Each structure stands twice: as structure tokens, then as C-alpha cells.
């Protein structure tokens, strides 16, 4: 279950400056990040993946093409095994080719590069000390230099000439007037009594617990959140303007409503932004939302399309805003046409409808749908100086860069695609050079560049070359099949390392989280981990997955564990019938939604010899009360538990736990506030009481994202446990001998 937390308000960032380094050939580093002291060296290849290989994988992200198209900056990240951490740096490579160079200090964390419009500065995010904020810059026209604070280069949307920036942020909070000494000032934040709390500590010095009055008192990845210390107040995000070279910023608006996603026109005369459709104050919008949230589910009211927001334009010097169009739904990712006469945006008419690209005249009118009934959904838009409009989209389990037909009469044209996953398309100012990162089933991420039309593609980095030379990554065969309702489902079967024709192999099926996420044509450590152990790895995108259009994605509402279960088991049937698969030695694994589904499967069938469940959900009513994401089931299960208790109970695996016979390994994080520990605990105790083989591994200092961003040592330990569990039950490997 991969949920995204709501965006936090934008924070004002001071700007730091460090002069561009002069890097000699001797300073060009072939290995991107020093790994520090290591354990015994790994054997040379070609060979199967070992757990220690995980520490060698380099991740490349956030590509940014310089305005002149001559360079690409990127974030390069690798684990530092000796220190149990990840480390990120900014690297730069010429688009003409050559060795990439490190541009930031190896002693500090740096990420998310972006160029100034004039190409004189490369900005990046870094938590280095000695400054007033997290945004720093590298100056390209002077050698050497150290990080210094500079507040004269603003952060935000800029016109073509780069003379100023427009951004949104709340007004400064009024300083507290003070009402005498605060008797709770020395208490821990969570122990302090929130505003309007009825109870108070008998002795503030002797209470170190948690005092909760707000529903949002814990957030996955953040932890426990203290309650408000004062009456609720609103600080709407206003429009601001700051000239380059000037530290002063000018406030353009003073309204009760927030301005979002502000973008300035190419000529600098106009600002487009998203705001409430009726420009109601934030306090009014929140009061309405809070009131509706308390009501029982009502199909007519809750399933009706709503006009959540609209696009407005205002002069860049300030003034009254003008609505561009009344459009039902939500708008995001606004971008101006190169001539500044039109606006494009990604619009979604309702939560269960596919996102489309729309274009509207900046003076008003009816938005035009450029994608028609095209099955797939766009992500961010780039309207290039050449007039071409391009975007990235998931096409089932792969992704591609596409060009939209501005007339809206033809389907988008695929420019760059293939059996891989692409992310982060970036362009130069002229709209002629494109960079992106890509990964395939047998290759971790690297940086690529091409002409903006997709021609002349070439790979610019080889950070993972030595790893790829040592390890034989397993590839997967893509297949499709018809399931319930004649719906076509996409799946993949990864061959085991050292595959020999005529031999039978065990098989493990992976079930993804979300449920509105997907597997696909990218390198994945978990698949390679089990394939290296000599197992087939099966993975599919059952109904409910993303990448196939909104109808497919939301077809499982109120029916989790029903047709989606059939989709999964149909794939198992197909693979189990292969002569090289041992159908008596099959396993299943998954996390979050996949954790729910694996426990559900355990109650439905005994055909699997072993199951491993991660971040599981076994009782939906318990989950609703203990998770930080109640909105998920309020939407997916049509209301709160007391609105639809029968459905919550029917879809809870714990109601059928007496049917479970399959040995199970439970993996859970102590600080997971998305799928809390109680679901795993009740499942563990139930299986123990019934004599079913079960183990539970609880990881400290870890949250819902352990398998993605957790501490490296714990993440690798988890991979080893999964390998050992299936090695024991599917291959007869003795305990502890499959941990490398």
C-alpha cells in the first residue's frame, strides 16, 4: 500500500552559493561515492547476486539539462555500507559525452539540482551547516570557492529573461503576545497539553507520555505530531515576487484563500495559479471538508463530481485575479505555451476518472482535451520552445516519453520507450535536448540523453558497470492473459539464475502494494534476490493497479480480495502448468496491499508451500483506528467502519484465520504508522495458537518504507530473511545457509 502523504506548505528557502569547482582529469571519479571500509571483497563474476551487492547499486535521479543543452546535472545516490546510511551528491556530465564529474562535497548530502534560466548557477538542496536554508548554488563562471549565504537569487517560477521569480508562501506568523510564563514549556512536545485539552498534567515535570486530541497525531515517516498549542488559525499561501539581485521580496496578494502552483508567463507579464473555485477562504473550505468528513457515506453526495479548484491569472505586478475557465474537477501542473497565449494543465474530472491534458486560452474559454479517450494517463507536461508538448506516461508496466497532438485529434506519439521505465524528462531552453533516467529489468538506473524528438539517444553514465559485469541479472518474460470478465492482465515471469532446461524450479509470486501502484519493466532488488536463489519469480498487475487507465485502477473499490485475487491466481495457474515449474514448491509474498493480499490468500488456499507477508493488514476496523490514512478505506470501502461494518468485516483476513495452514513469515516495522504493528501481532498469535509454523521479525527505527528507504543494514537483513524463508520451505535449504 503505497500512500503519499499530503504536501506540506512550501517553506521559504535562503540561497547558498558555492563557486564551480575546476576538476582535473585526475579528479574525475569512476566510483561515484566512497563506500568506506568494507567487509571481505565479493567474488568476481559472472555470478548470482549476493546480499552485499545491494550496497553497490548506484541510483541516478533528478536529471536537469542546462539551458544551453551542454550539460546534465543529476543526483547520484549510493549506500555507504560501513556507516549504515545512504549518501547523495550532485554530478554533472556533458551531453556530448565524457566522464561525469562530482560537483558537490563528498562530506555533505546534496540532491535535486536545477539550473538558473541564464545558466550561471546550478542550485541544489543540501542540509549543510552554516546557512539559513537548504538551497545552495554552484557558480559556473568562477573557479574554487566555499559555500556562502546568498539571498539575492530567489527560488520560484521565472520568465524567460530570468529577471525575477514568483512563488507562494504564507505570510509571517504574528509574534506571540505572551500571557505570562508557560508552565508546560519544559515538557516534551507530545507531552504538552494541546490547546483546548480538558486535562492537564498533575506535575509537568513528572509526565513524559503523549497527550492527543487531534486525529492527525501520527504520520508515517514523521512519527508522532504534537497537537496545536494555540487556537487554530489559517495562513493562506500568498503570491510573492522577488527580483534577481535583490534580497527584498514583494507580497502581491493578501487574501483569505491560498494560491498554489504559481507559474509566470514567458514574457513575465502574467501569473497563473490554482485556487478554490469560488475563492473561498481556507478556513471556510476546511470547515466544509471537516463537516462532510463526519457524515455517513452517501452515494449521491460522495460520488458526485466536484469543482475542487480552478485556474486563475493575475498581472505579475499584482491586481485582481481573473478565472480562466470553470472546469469541473482538479487542475495541476500548469504550464504556459511558448507564446504566452495559452495554458495547459493536467486535469482530472473526478477521482475515479483518468487524468487528461487540457489547453485553454489565457483570456478564457472552454478547455480542450488533447488526449481524448486514450487509455493511459500523463504525468508532468513540458511545452517546449519549439511548440511541441511532451510528457511521460506509464504504459502498463513500462513508461515512455510522448508528444501530444495539439489539435487533440490523434493519439500521442511515442518518442522514447521500449522495455524499460523512464523518469524525470528534462529539456534545454531551446527545447531541442532531452535527458532522462531509465532502468530495465536487467539494468539499474542510468542517465540518457537524446534529441527532444527521441532521436539520437545515447547513454551518458555507467555508474553500475562494474556491478553489471559481476552479477548476472535475471530477465523476465512478459505475458498477458484474460481473467474474470475477459479483462486482460499483464504479467512477467523471471527466470532463476543458472536456469537449466529440463529441470523443475520453485516459484514465488510477488504482489505489489498500493493497491494503485504497479510492477513493470525496471530493475528490482527483491525480484533479483529470489531469482539469484534459484527460483522463478512471478509478478503481475491485477485489476486495481495503476498504468492502465482509471477504470482499471478503481475497478476494485469495495471488492478487494475478489476479482483481484482471481487475477493473481489465474497467473499462478498459468505458470504452475509449465513443465519447468514445481507446482508443489510455490510461495507468495507482498507488502502493504500485497501484505493484505498474502494473508487473504492464506485463508483461501493451501496450494502455497510458504508465504511471507510485509506491512500486513488483517483487520480493517483495527487498521482504520490505528493507521494514518483513514481516507483510503473511506473511499475504497464506501464509508467508515460503522457506515459499512459488514464490508470491513468481510474483507478482513482475521475473520477466516482458522483456515490458514501455510507457514508464514511476518515482517513489520516498529514505527510503521501506515500499516501498524497490531495487524501482524494478532495474525502471529492466531497462527501460533493453531500450530501453524510462523515467525515474526520486527525492525526498529523503521517505518512503512523500510523496503525502499530504510536503514541499509536492516533493508538488506530483510532481503536475507525472505531468501532464507523460501529457501527453507521451497528448496530444503538448512536454516541460516541461504543468507548471503
Identify the meaning behind each predicted range.
Residues 64, 166, 214-221, 225-227, ...:
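Non-catalytic accessory segments flanking enzyme active sites
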Residues 526, 532, 539-740:
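Active-site-proximal cap/loop segments of hydrolase catalytic domains
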Residues 281, 500-505, 510-548:
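Short substrate-entry loop that stabilizes the transition state in hydrolases
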Residues 67-68, 117-118, 160-161, 266-267, ...:
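Residue-level detector of Asp-centered blade-edge/turn motifs that repeat once per structural unit
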Residues 33-59, 83-86, 92-111, 126-127, ...:
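Multi-bladed beta-propeller domains
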Residues 69-72, 119-122, 165, 271, ...:
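Hydrophobic beta-strand positions that form the internal "hydrophobic ladder"
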Residues 78-82, 128-131, 172-175, 278-281, ...:
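Short glycine/acidic-enriched loop and turn motifs that connect beta-strands
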Residues 29-34, 87-88, 170-245, 277-312, ...:
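Predominantly five- to eight-bladed beta-propeller fold
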Amino acid at each position: 500500500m503505497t500512500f503519499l502523504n499530503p504536501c506540506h506548505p512550501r517553506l521559504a528557502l535562503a540561497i547558498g552559493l558555492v563557486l564551480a569547482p575546476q576538476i582535473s582529469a585526475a579528479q574525475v571519479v569512476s566510483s561515484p561515492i566512497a563506500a568506506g571500509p568494507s567487509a571481505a571483497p565479493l567474488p568476481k563474476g559472472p555470478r548470482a547476486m549476493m546480499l552485499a551487492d545491494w550496497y553497490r547499486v548506484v541510483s541516478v535521479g533528478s536529471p536537469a539539462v542546462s539551458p544551453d543543452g551542454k550539460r546534465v546535472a543529476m543526483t547520484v545516490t549510493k549506500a555507504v555500507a560501513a556507516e549504515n546510511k545512504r549518501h547523495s551528491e550532485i554530478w554533472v556530465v556533458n551531453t556530448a559525452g565524457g566522464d561525469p564529474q562530482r560537483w558537490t562535497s563528498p562530506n555533505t548530502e546534496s540532491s535535486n539540482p536545477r539550473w538558473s534560466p541564464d545558466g550561471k548557477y546550478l542550485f541544489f538542496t543540501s542540509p549543510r551547516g552554516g546557512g539559513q536554508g537548504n538551497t545552495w548554488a554552484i557558480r559556473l563562471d568562477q573557479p574554487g570557492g566555499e559555500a556562502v549565504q546568498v539571498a539575492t537569487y530567489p527560488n520560484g517560477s521565472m520568465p524567460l529573461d530570468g529577471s525575477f521569480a514568483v512563488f507562494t508562501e504564507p505570510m509571517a506568523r504574528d509574534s506571540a503576545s505572551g500571557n505570562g510564563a508557560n508552565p508546560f514549556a519544559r515538557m516534551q512536545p507530545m507531552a504538552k497539553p494541546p490547546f483546548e485539552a480538558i486535562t492537564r498534567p498533575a506535575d509537568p515535570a513528572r509526565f513524559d507520555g503523549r497527550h492527543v486530541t487531534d486525529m492527525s497525531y501520527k504520520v508515517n515517516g514523521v512519527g508522532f505530531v504534537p497537537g496545536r498549542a494555540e487556537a487554530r488559525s489559517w495562513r493562506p499561501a500568498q503570491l510573492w515576487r522577488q527580483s534577481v539581485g535583490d534580497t527584498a521580496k514583494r507580497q502581491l496578494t493578501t487574501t483569505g484563500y491560498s494560491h498554489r502552483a504559481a507559474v509566470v508567463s514567458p514574457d513575465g507579464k502574467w501569473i497563473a495559479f490554482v485556487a478554490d473555485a469560488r475563492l473561498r477562504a481556507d478556513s471556510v473550505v476546511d470547515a466544509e471538508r471537516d463537516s462532510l468528513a463526519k457524515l455517513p457515506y452517501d452515494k449521491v453526495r460522495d460520488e458526485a463530481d466536484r469543482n475542487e479548484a480552478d485556474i486563475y491569472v493575475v498581472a505579475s505586478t499584482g491586481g485582481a485575479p481573473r478565472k480562466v475557465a470553470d472546469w469541473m474537477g482538479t487542475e495541476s501542473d500548469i504550464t504556459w505555451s511558448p507564446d504566452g497565449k495559452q495554458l495547459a494543465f493536467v486535469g482530472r474530472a473526478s477521482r475515479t476518472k483518468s487524468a487528461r491534458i487540457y489547453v485553454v486560452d489565457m483570456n478564457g474559454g472552454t478547455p480542450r482535451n488533447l488526449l481524448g479517450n486514450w487509455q493511459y494517463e500523463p504525468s508532468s507536461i513540458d511545452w517546449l520552445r519549439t511548440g511541441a508538448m511532451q510528457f511521460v506516461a506509464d504504459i502498463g508496466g513500462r513508461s515512455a516519453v510522448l508528444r501530444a497532438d495539439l489539435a487533440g485529434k490523434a493519439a500521442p506519439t511515442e518518442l522514447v520507450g521500449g522495455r524499460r521505465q523512464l523518469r524525470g524528462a528534462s529539456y534545454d531552453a531551446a527545447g531541442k535536448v532531452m535527458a532522462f533516467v531509465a532502468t530495465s529489468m536487467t539494468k539499474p538506473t542510468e542517465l540518457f540523453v537524446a534529441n527532444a524528438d527521441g532521436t539520437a539517444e545515447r547513454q551518458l553514465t555507467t555508474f553500475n558497470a562494474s556491478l553489471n559485469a559481476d552479477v548476472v541479472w535475471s530477465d523476465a518474460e512478459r505475458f498477458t492473459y484474460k481473467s474474470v470478465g475477459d479483462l486482460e492482465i499483464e504479467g512477467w515471469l523471471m527466470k532463476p539464475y543458472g536456469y537449466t532446461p529440463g529441470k523443475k524450479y520453485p516459484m514465488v509470486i510477488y504482489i505489489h502494494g498500493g493497491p494503485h501502484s504497479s510492477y513493470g519493466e525496471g530493475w528490482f532488488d527483491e525480484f533479483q534476490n529470489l531469482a539469484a536463489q534459484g527460483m522463478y519469480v512471478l509478478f503481475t498487475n491485477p485489476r486495481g493497479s495503476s498504468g492502465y487507465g482509471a477504470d482499471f485502477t478503481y475497478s476494485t473499490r469495495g471488492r478487494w480480495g475478489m476479482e483481484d485475487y482471481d487475477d493473481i491466481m489465474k497467473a499462478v495457474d498459468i505458470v504452475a502448468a509449465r513443465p519447468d515449474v514445481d507446482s508443489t514448491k510455490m510461495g507468495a509474498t507482498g507488502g502493504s496491499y500485497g501484505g493484505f493480499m498474502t494473508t487473504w490468500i492464506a485463508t483461501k488456499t493451501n496450494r502455497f508451500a510458504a508465504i511471507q507477508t510485509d506491512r500486513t493488514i488483517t483487520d480493517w476496523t483495527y487498521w482504520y483506528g490505528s493507521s494514518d490514512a483513514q481516507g483510503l478505506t473511506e473511499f475504497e470501502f464506501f464509508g467508515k467502519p460503522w457506515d459499512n461494518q459488514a464490508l470491513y468485516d468481510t474483507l478482513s483476513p482475521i475473520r477466516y484465520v482458522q483456515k490458514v495452514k501455510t507457514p508464514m513469515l511476518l515482517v513489520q516495522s516498529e514505527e510503521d504508522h501506515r500499516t501498524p504493528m497490531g495487524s501482524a501481532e494478532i495474525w502471529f498469535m492466531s497462527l501460533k495458537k493453531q500450530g501453524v509454523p510462523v515467525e515474526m521479525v520486527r525492525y526498529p527505527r523503521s517505518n512503512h518504507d523500510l523496503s525502499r528507504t530504510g536503514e541499509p543494514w536492516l533493508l538488506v537483513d530483510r532481503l536475507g530473511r525472505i531468501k532464507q524463508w523460501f529457501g527453507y520451505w521451497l528448496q530444503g535449504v538448512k536454516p541460516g545457509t541461504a543468507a548471503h
